[in-house]
Amino acid sequence: MKLASYHCVEFGDNVRVGWDAIIMDTDFHRMKNRETGTFTKGYAPVLIGRNCWIGCRCTILKGTKLPAYCTLAAGTTIGKKIDGEGYKIISNTSELKIVKENYYRELGNDAIVYPVDSINNR
């Protein structure tokens, strides 16, 4: 497992993680909206409930929240909150979709500013 935590990654009890999984609470950069000039935050907590099973080669991105007793199928990429009770098996579909428009990475002005107390106040 590869873990990149600059803000908050929390695991419930008895979580199992398969080999070559990646868990990140950061994008390592921000994105700029070309219309408004505003930037994305670039980080968000990752919360994994108890008794979850993360299959091999899964990628868990910022903003992911898994309720208890969820299984991520091998190779799944997730970056969102799963609502409701757990006991779900989650897998990606083969459908490709555009998730945001009018954003780009502005090189040289894409550093993330993390809250100073984000590590100490979990």
What are these regions (language model features)?
Residues C8-V9, R30:
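Short, catalytically relevant binding-site loops at active-site mouths
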Residues V9-E10, I23:
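Extracellular beta-strand scaffolds
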Residues F11, V17:
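A contiguous pocket-lining binding segment that forms or flanks enzyme active sites
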Residues G18-R122:
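Glycine-rich hexapeptide-repeat left-handed beta-helix
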